[in-house]
């Protein structure tokens, strides 16, 4: 059996920039469980974090911020080799109808033949995800939404949520430094407690609750 990981002893103090919900004043990263959950110690007790849900929340807010500020080009990552993605006729039509919204998220994308798009750049936040899967997810969610609502802000939120959702089943291997960075980025979110789909990002276990369960005090 491999030795247990050594906790990162540094305590990370969370700065107050006025934008974050500040779930805690400081944290100490402890470990990542075999099932992938992150464990940290805070001033409130022990916190268990779902890193996939955390990445969804971070990505969602950053995409919306970029779209609102019209800074999509500055937050895009240019592909070394442009990628072509062929979709079903229905999915192609859905992306085509929402092309400006997709571009606001950071995609440099254009039509490239029958039912095909050419992608020259993608949002920095999704550099590790397969582009075809992300576009298919966006198309699916656009189809599910139908025309029940309209408006630029609503479309931005829908597409950003679809892109972020692509992390749900993705591999997310984290080093200790990567885990700490993820927690720091989560702390800067406006709504760090739930992912865009409403699922919990973290579970708190207070020191008082731990003492009660262990019949201490």
Regions found by a protein language model. Name each.
Residues 3-217:
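Long, charged low-complexity intrinsically disordered regions
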